């Protein structure tokens, strides 16, 4: 990162970006797109005209966010967690208000009610500016389906949650653990779901950041959302009931599992 104003002081956000950069540098050879992410981080500059306004985060959303941060326990992610805590007061969290989708996109009630994101580097609404690159954090509530979708922007996810489910290119669902990386090339379809913990991740759009996301309709959305809703009700009734409703794929949720997808 560089600075437009040499008098700008070090911020919690810059330290957070540095922690993310350090994590990605150690995995630079695992996915080709990481090199582009790192190059764009290095070429970002302090935003001179930052608008920090955003929707007020509700008490429930704040509780969900704090739970997601507390759930970051994998050793490789602890510097990011600690930097995130120090930068909390500098971050502005927003819900997607048709910024990433057209206004008529049916993303499901779970997504609409619980999605939050904050930007660290972006063309707008971030402390650091890049004309065509974004880096930030994305949050979804527990037991939520983020429906199958695609976008022109190549995308990197760094999973921070203990476990999250992913469906890539319409294939089978597979679970990934904390520290795992997901790479989606341009217009590659992907979906994710959370279980009894919030879904929390670092995300980055490498280029084409002004392109909108589009849904890739699947016939099983209603069933998936009903299953997640039933698991949510079971968790309210007592966590001792929850293991009976969780997916069988938990052994795949290994730390540092990495999937590489070709563009």
Model-derived features with residue positions:
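Extended repeat-based interaction scaffolds and adjacent low-complexity, acidic/S/T/P-biased segments
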Residues: 3-4
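A short, N-terminal "cap"/entry segment at the start of jelly-roll beta-barrel domains
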Residues: 9-130, 230-231, 241-245, 259-263
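Exposed loop/turn and edge beta-strand positions of beta-sandwich/beta-sheet ligand-binding modules
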Residues: 114, 134, 153
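Short acidic-glycine-tyrosine-enriched beta hairpin
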Residues: 130-132, 156, 170-189
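Short, conserved beta-strand element in jelly-roll/cupin
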Residues: 137-143, 149-166
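Short beta-strand His + acidic residue motifs that chelate non-heme Fe in jelly-roll/DSBH
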Residues: 146-149, 165-168, 184, 189-195
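A short beta-strand motif that forms part of the nucleic acid-binding face
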Residues: 152-153, 160-163, 170-172, 196, ...
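Double-stranded beta-helix
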Residues: 195-263
């Amino acid at each position: 990162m560089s600075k437009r104003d040499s008098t700008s002081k070090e911020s919690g956000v810059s330290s957070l970006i540095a922690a993310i950069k350090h994590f990605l540098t150690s995995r630079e050879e695992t996915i080709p797109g990481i090199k582009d992410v790192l190059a764009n981080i290095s070429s970002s500059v302090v935003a001179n005209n930052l608008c920090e306004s955003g929707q007020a985060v509700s008490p429930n959303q704040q509780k969900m966010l704090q739970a997601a941060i507390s759930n970051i326990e994998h050793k490789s992610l602890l510097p990011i967690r600690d930097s995130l805590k120090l930068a909390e007061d500098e971050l502005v969290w927003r819900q997607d208000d048709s910024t990433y989708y057209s206004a008529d996109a049916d993303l499901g009630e779970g997504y609409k009610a619980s999605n939050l994101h904050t930007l660290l580097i972006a063309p707008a609404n971030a402390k650091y500016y890049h004309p065509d690159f974004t880096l930030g954090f994305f949050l979804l509530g527990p037991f939520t389906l983020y429906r199958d979708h695609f976008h022109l922007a190549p995308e990197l996810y760094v999973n921070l949650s203990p476990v999250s489910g992913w469906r890539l290119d319409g294939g089978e669902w597979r679970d990934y653990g904390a520290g795992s990386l997901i790479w989606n090339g341009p217009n590659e379809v992907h979906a994710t779901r959370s279980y009894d913990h919030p879904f929390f991740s670092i995300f980055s759009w490498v280029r084409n950041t002004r392109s909108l996301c589009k849904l890739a309709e699947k016939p099983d959305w209603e069933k998936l959302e009903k299953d997640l809703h039933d698991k949510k009700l079971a968790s309210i009734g007592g966590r001792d009931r929850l293991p009976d409703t969780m997916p069988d794929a938990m052994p795949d949720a290994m730390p540092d599992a990495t999937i590489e997808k070709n563009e």
